[in-house]
């Protein structure tokens, strides 16, 4: 019987990526094969832990400096919203985060089907 393949799809951020590494390591200790779908900006993180990576662009490709500026501006622009109640954040921070999640899903649809066909996972784990 061959090992079950678990495909990890962490958000393109170190917290979710490293969380997936820990879960993937535990899976491999139990005889599973772990593979990771990663965004270009996180490429190399999972390989550094010995996992097979499959890059799927989650946004329009841009130089690292431009991507860093985008996220810095996004967070800095929302700092005042973090003083608001969760309810008051719905029309600003929550809405913009949701729109970003939808945009990443649209971008992922361009390459993700090919990765899923190549990997043929038995289980998919998503960390958003």
State where each predicted segment sits.
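Glycosyltransferase specificity loop/lid
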Residues: 1-128
